[in-house]
């Protein structure tokens, strides 16, 4: 199925590219999320007219994402208190939602889907490095300090 991309999609292309994808991928993911439209004659003509407008909109979104990433990097670290045992192991774990809530409370709006935990959830006290993917091209980094709750 031929589609026109309205946004940058990993391993596929960027704004304006006409790509061939499987029908299910287009119908169930790309089109509902507003990342693509079917490549009909009408849509191709419509896209060519609006191309500059869409590129400006994407540039604005990218600038906003870079500003948020800078704010996250400037935070330096966020502290989260959790119940733990004697050896520093937590009762339970700290996941993406807990980290997103802590960063949002610190003053930078972050969604849980933007938090990247490559080694899984945090299960020990101490300092952990956490990545944030604010945009497909923009990443930020933050130290999360997990302390034992009194």
UniProtKB/Swiss-Prot annotation:
Query: Which GO terms of the cellular component aspect does the record hold?
Result: ribonucleoprotein complex; ribosome
Gene Ontology biological process terms in this record: translation
Tell me, what's a Pfam family for it?
A: Ribosomal_L9_N
Q: Which GO terms describe its molecular function?
A: rRNA binding; structural constituent of ribosome
Q: Does the keyword Aminoacyl-tRNA synthetase apply?
A: no
- SUPFAM superfamilies hit by this protein: L9 N-domain-like, Ribosomal protein L9 C-domain
Concerning InterPro entries, the annotation shows: Ribosomal_bL9 (IPR000244), Ribosomal_bL9/RNase_H1_N (IPR009027), Ribosomal_bL9_bac/chp (IPR020594), Ribosomal_bL9_C (IPR020069), Ribosomal_bL9_C_sf (IPR036791), Ribosomal_bL9_N (IPR020070), Ribosomal_bL9_N_sf (IPR036935)
Concerning PROSITE patterns, the annotation shows: RIBOSOMAL_L9 (PS00651)
What's in the keyword line of the UniProt record?
Ribonucleoprotein, Ribosomal protein, RNA-binding, rRNA-binding
Q: Briefly state the protein's biological role.
A: Binds to the 23S rRNA.
Identify its protein family.
Belongs to the bacterial ribosomal protein bL9 family.
| Protein name according to UniProt | Large ribosomal subunit protein bL9
Q: Which organism is it from?
A: Serratia proteamaculans (strain 568)
């Amino acid at each position: 199925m031929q589609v026109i991309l309205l946004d940058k999609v990993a391993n596929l292309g960027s704004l304006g590219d006409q790509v061939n994808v499987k029908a299910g991928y287009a119908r169930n993911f790309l089109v509902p999320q507003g990342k693509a439209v079917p490549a009909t004659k009408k849509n191709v003509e419509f896209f060519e007219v609006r191309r500059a407008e869409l590129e400006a909109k994407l540039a604005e979104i990218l600038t906003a994402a870079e500003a948020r990433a800078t704010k996250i990097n400037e935070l330096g670290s966020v502290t989260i208190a959790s119940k733990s045992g004697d050896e520093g192991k937590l009762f339970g774990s700290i996941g993406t939602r807990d980290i997103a809530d802590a960063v949002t409370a610190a003053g930078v709006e972050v969604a849980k889907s933007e938090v990247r935990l490559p080694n899984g959830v945090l299960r020990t006290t101490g300092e952990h490095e956490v990545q944030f993917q604010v945009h497909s091209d923009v990443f930020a980094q933050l130290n999360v300090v997990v302390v034992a709750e009194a």
